[in-house]
């Protein structure tokens, strides 16, 4: 996490077919799904962009894995929407949701909500650090008992790192 925060973790940008990547992530996540939860990949338009494949996969896989942990039954949807200057990825679940008073803290290090995870509470902090290093932002909307939607917005044009 400290390498991410100091921008010393190198990003490797290459042209990437985002639709194909999403299908690969879908196949990988489908193997982790438990009975009673449906996984749906939103039908997205074709998109090729320059991005770091490994980091984008890490971010989306982490968000999807969290959705699985917190959705006992229902559905998990994910996909992306393109705008003129950016692409917004989303992971939506019909799980337990996040209490309103906890929303502002979930991207902090070592934060876990009651009965929320078996991890150490670094996943969302790492996601946020990577997204910011890639020139984007991450946010969440949630309602207890209804689920959550995580949004990751990344620029279509590779960000320039100032030295």
Where in the sequence are the language-model features?
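Helix-loop junction within the histidine kinase core
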Residues: 2-13
């Amino acid at each position: 996490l400290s390498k991410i925060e100091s921008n010393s973790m190198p990003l490797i940008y290459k042209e990437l077919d985002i639709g194909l990547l999403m299908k690969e992530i879908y196949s990988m996540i489908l193997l982790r799904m438990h009975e009673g939860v449906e996984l749906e990949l939103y039908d997205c338009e074709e998109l090729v962009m320059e991005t770091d494949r490994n980091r984008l996969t890490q971010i989306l896989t982490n968000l999807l894995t969290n959705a699985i942990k917190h959705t006992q039954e229902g559905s998990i949807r994910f996909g992306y929407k393109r705008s003129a200057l950016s692409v917004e990825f989303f992971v939506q679940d019909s799980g337990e949701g996040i209490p309103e008073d906890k929303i502002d803290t979930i991207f902090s290090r070592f934060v876990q909500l009651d009965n929320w995870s078996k991890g150490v509470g670094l996943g969302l902090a790492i996601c946020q650090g990577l997204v910011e290093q890639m020139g984007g932002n991450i946010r969440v909307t949630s309602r207890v008992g209804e689920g959550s939607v995580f949004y990751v917005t990344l620029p279509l044009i590779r960000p320039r790192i100032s030295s």
